[in-house]
């Protein structure tokens, strides 16, 4: 299928749903900067393979935004695609909300997959479109209906990171996070950023190239935790670590139904710049949202003595490799 044929198929799906605009960002369900093959929907639809970009498809036009690293590449790859290149930061180039506002009608419908856009991103766009009285349609992945040979989600097993490398147990990390939750009077903490979960749970994986994480979600309560992950990817050490720390394992996609069960009188700590729109939309509207960065962000930035020593060892190995690659024969 050519890019033009893909766009035509997408527009047919949009027409069935009375959508004026459909947005395809470069993201996965966890707001990860670099995404795995399954999540390269923008690349599939546009033909542009750079690591950063956003595609907006309207009834009779389409545009792609990217930054200065990719202007030359994007101009070349978008030839004959009918997609206009929007060079971010250049004078006269509209922002994404401005472009949507121009091409969406009054009382129109704005579509996207709610799992690949973070909550704050959606709010910021809708704030700029409030005069148009827009309806959001975020329940379906339209690209997935077109992408017949889409790569599957990764299934390779991860591994438990021993304390001789992490320097701190999962038990102690969860206790520290619960202390911060108490300060905020939070009953629940939703964590969706993969690096944070990897640090908290002392686990690593191979789900994204050059980024040792596993696709999963984590919900921490006052007494127990819930992790949402492909169970086949867990080894015995990881299962034992979860059991020791009262971590209940659920299927990866069950997060969306699980958050519906959080009671209305709960107080949920989460970061709207990271947690995807579909998750927050499934929360009871009476829940008090505490919007702030994950406590683990600052915690993992403060390296303990074991981590510092391991960093030194890693730097020595890197230095030797660099010298070997640059020395003269």
Which residues does each predicted region cover?
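Terminal domain-start leader segments
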Residues: 1-329
């Amino acid at each position: 299928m050519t890019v033009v044929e893909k766009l035509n198929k997408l527009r047919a799906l949009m027409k069935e749903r009375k959508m004026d605009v459909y947005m395809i960002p470069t993201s996965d369900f966890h707001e990860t900067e670099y995404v795995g093959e399954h999540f390269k929907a923008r690349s599939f639809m546009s033909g542009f393979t750079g690591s950063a970009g956003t595609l907006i498809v309207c009834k009779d036009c389409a545009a792609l935004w990217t930054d200065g690293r990719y202007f030359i590449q994007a101009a070349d790859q978008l030839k004959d695609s009918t997609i206009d290149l929007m060079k971010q930061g250049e004078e006269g180039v509209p922002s994404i909300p401005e472009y949507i506002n121009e091409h969406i009608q009054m009382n129109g419908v704005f579509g996207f997959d709610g799992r690949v856009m973070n909550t704050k991103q959606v709010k910021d766009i809708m704030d700029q479109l409030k005069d148009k009285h827009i309806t959001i349609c975020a329940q379906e992945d339209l690209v997935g209906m077109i992408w017949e040979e889409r790569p599957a989600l990764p299934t390779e097993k991860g591994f438990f990171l021993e304390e001789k490398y992490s320097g701190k147990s999962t038990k102690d990390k969860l206790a520290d996070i619960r202390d911060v939750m108490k300060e905020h009077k939070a009953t629940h903490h939703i964590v969706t950023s993969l690096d944070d979960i990897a640090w908290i749970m002392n686990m690593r994986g191979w789900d994204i190239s050059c980024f040792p994480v596993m696709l999963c979600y984590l919900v921490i309560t006052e007494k127990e935790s819930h992790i949402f992950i492909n169970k086949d990817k867990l080894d015995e050490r990881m299962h034992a670590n979860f059991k020791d720390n009262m971590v209940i394992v659920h299927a990866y996609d069950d997060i969306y139904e699980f958050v519906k069960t959080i009671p209305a009188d709960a107080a949920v700590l989460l970061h709207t710049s990271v947690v995807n729109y579909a998750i927050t939309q499934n929360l009871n509207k009476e829940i008090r949202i505490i919007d702030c960065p994950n406590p683990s962000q600052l915690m993992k930035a403060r390296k303990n003595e074991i981590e510092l020593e391991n960093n030194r060892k890693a730097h020595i190995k890197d230095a030797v490799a660099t010298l070997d690659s640059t020395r003269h024969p």
